Amino acid sequence: MVNTNVLGAIRTTKAFTPYFRQKRAGLFINTTSIGGLLTVPFNSIYHATKWALEGWSESMAFELNQFGIGIKTIEPGGMKTDFFTRSFDTGRHPAYDALVNKVMGIITDPKQMATYSSPEQIAEVVYEAATDGKDQLRYIAGADARAMYAMRLQLGDEAFRKAIAQQFFGDAQKAA
């Protein structure tokens, strides 16, 4: 996951930057995730890679801007695909089984999944980022992602963590 989600983007950017710098123009678009701006339980490696790509992209945006090169990030939320069942980190100790099952039940609940975006909806956001000419770093894609991110900004980090813990674990766990 680190090779694909982080090192792949870094290597691609390093490969194209000399050409873009010579032309004094270019645009990199990295697909991160709302999981690079906030987290949910039991997907820590995925979240770590997306947070790394978010931080790296933001830093590189400062560095490359002086050469007319932009970097933009797309942060999709839930997708109407089999992504969750394929990528969810379920390789845990059996002590976590009940909690993992509860979290998976919430994430894959049909009512919840109805709020997720189609690949075509995310493609529209990518197109917007590629063509709008704005010096904007982040494009949060999908109604669920926008709602979750707005909630995090409104509540602040600690209150948001407590709300997520309550949503997924109820009284079984309190955010430390």
Regions found by a protein language model. Give the residues of each.
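Active-site-adjacent segment of SDR/Rossmann-fold oxidoreductases
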Residues: 19-20, 38, 59-70
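Active-site loop immediately N-terminal to the catalytic Tyr-X3-Lys motif
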Residues: 38-44
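SDR active-site lid
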Residues: 66-136
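Residue(s) in the substrate-gating loop at a strand-loop-helix junction
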Residues: 33
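A hydrophobic alpha-helix adjacent to the NAD(P)-binding/active-site core of NAD(P)-dependent oxidoreductases
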Residues: 1-2
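A short helix-coil junction within the Rossmann-fold of NAD(P)-dependent oxidoreductases
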Residues: 15-24
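Active-site helix of classical SDR
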Residues: 13, 49
